[in-house]
Amino acid sequence: MSDPKFSIIGSGSIGIGWAIVFARAGYKVKVFDVEESALRNFEIQVKNRLELLDENKLLDDSPKKIAARIETTLDLAEAVAGADYVQECGPENLELKRELFTKLAGLTNSDVILASSSSALRTSEFASGIASNARCLVVHPGNPPYLISVAEVVPADFTSNESVEVCKKLLIKVGIIPIQVNNEP
């Protein structure tokens, strides 16, 4: 995958962090949220954090160039269209994650990685009943991921080895060190 496309579901603090990671690495990112006000706040926060990173000489590109790689949308289907990797960053709500991963499975090709940033819920809890769940896993980042460039990669028993390897390669490509956890906590 020479030019992967990234999607982020949820525009809160973790979504902001992932967007900066992917865009800073030179890739286009689409960010979805259900509220327009949340997306406007997201854009302000990304701009502010990029400027702070730039002031501390932690960027290779200008904040403006990096921010230009990030697009926001209120349309979930538009957000994941053409994506190779989807990073879910929603609230720690089991029913919400189940519903969201079911939708994501229906909107994406079966080889698209569907990752959750969850720190409390297991992949087996929210993805066990969905189609093509072999591509689902938890990818829990250091916070903020643009400064603490490590992420736990936690597959479920049903997650394929191929999906885990593709995920780890994509993380390395964007400057994140993947630490694989072999058993869900």
Model feature map: region roles:
Residues 1-52:
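NAD(P)+-binding Rossmann beta1-loop-alpha1 motif at the extreme N-terminus of oxidoreductases
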Residues 6, 31, 66-85, 166-176, ...:
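Amphipathic alpha-helical segments at domain termini/boundaries
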Residues 20-23, 80, 105, 127, ...:
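A structural alpha-helix within SAM-dependent methyltransferase catalytic domains
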Residues 22, 47-54, 87, 108, ...:
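Structural signal for hydrophobic packing residues in well-ordered secondary-structure cores
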Residues 31-64, 153-163, 178, 185:
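Rossmann-like dinucleotide-binding cores of NAD(P)H-dependent redox enzymes
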Residues 37-41, 52-114, 121-122:
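Rossmann-like NAD(P)-binding element
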